[in-house]
């Protein structure tokens, strides 16, 4: 089963298959993910699914964005892969109740910068006198 997850500019693809319960991110075990808080965030779908997902191998390839965006995209892709592989609507509803972004992409992106200022909304001050 192949699923995707997106967050900001990061895109993650997860492949779920029967196995020993190993989760990899870009070929590395999830236990080696550099930031502990984000590692725990990535593992949330597996903790919620508990025994249902213990015999699934999930391989995630993630590109673009920063570490937080990649972690959120990976998390969504993993949750979708578990639901799609098990074909379990009850589990999907459980994910939605816990956190809607486990199943639905968080589509918020940074507003692009515009001319005449430092950011998307900020403008250079002008003097009237």
Swiss-Prot record:
Q: Identify the Pfam families for this entry.
A: Ribosomal_S9
What GO terms fall under cellular component here? Answer: cytosolic small ribosomal subunit
Q: Which UniProt keywords apply?
A: Ribonucleoprotein, Ribosomal protein
Could you tell me one molecular function GO term of this UniProt entry?
A: RNA binding
The transmembrane residues are: none
> Which BP terms from GO are recorded?
maturation of SSU-rRNA from tricistronic rRNA transcript (SSU-rRNA, 5.8S rRNA, LSU-rRNA); translation
Q: Which family does it belong to?
A: Belongs to the universal ribosomal protein uS9 family.
Protein's UniProt name: Small ribosomal subunit protein uS9
User: Organism source for this protein?
Assistant: Thermoplasma acidophilum (strain ATCC 25905 / DSM 1728 / JCM 9062 / NBRC 15155 / AMRC-C165)
């Amino acid at each position: 089963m192949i699923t995707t997850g997106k967050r900001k500019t990061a895109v993650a693809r997860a492949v779920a298959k029967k196995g020993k319960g190993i989760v990899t991110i870009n070929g590395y075990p999830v236990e080696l993910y550099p930031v502990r808080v984000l590692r725990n965030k990535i593992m949330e779908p597996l903790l919620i699914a508990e025994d249902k997902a213990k015999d699934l191998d999930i391989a995630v390839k993630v590109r673009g964005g920063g570490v937080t965006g990649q972690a959120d995209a990976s998390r969504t892709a993993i949750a979708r892969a578990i639901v799609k592989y098990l074909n379990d609507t009850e589990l999907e509803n459980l994910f939605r109740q816990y956190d809607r972004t486990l199943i639905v992409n968080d589509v918020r992106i940074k507003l692009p910068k515009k001319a005449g200022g430092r950011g998307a909304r900020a403008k250079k001050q002008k003097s009237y006198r």
